[in-house]
């Protein structure tokens, strides 16, 4: 498969496998909103704030850790995602963008998360 044809969902699955294999305590976070109910019981549910990373939790040392997954070609951070990643890192946590499971593993190792 050509890199430009790899969707973000494949990257998310690869990173999820790395998280499971290493035992790091990160969970998948979905952002956005959806509607439940009908008529007068119809409600909008917001799942997470804009900029929340795809995986968030804590590393083996107890530090806050977040991974944002992007397609290898063409995946771009939103302003809210960039701000959140920068803010987490500035406050002593670990946050980064991964374009593959291999890249996520390398970043986790280099940053002392495992």
What is the predicted role of each segment?
Residues 1-114:
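Catalytic phosphate/metal-binding cores of nucleic-acid and nucleotide-processing enzymes, i.e., regions
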């Amino acid at each position: 498969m050509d890199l430009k044809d790899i969707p973000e969902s494949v990257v998310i699955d690869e990173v999820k496998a790395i998280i499971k294999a290493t035992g790091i305590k990160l969970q998948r976070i979905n952002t956005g909103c959806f509607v439940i109910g009908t008529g007068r019981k119809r409600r909008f549910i917001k799942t997470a704030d804009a900029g929340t990373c795809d995986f968030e939790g804590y590393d083996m040392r107890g530090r806050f850790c977040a991974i944002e997954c992007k397609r290898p070609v063409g995946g771009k951070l939103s302003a809210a995602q960039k701000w959140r990643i920068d803010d987490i890192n500035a406050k002593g946590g670990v946050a980064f963008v991964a374009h593959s499971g291999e890249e996520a593993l390398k970043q986790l190792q280099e940053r002392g998360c495992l």
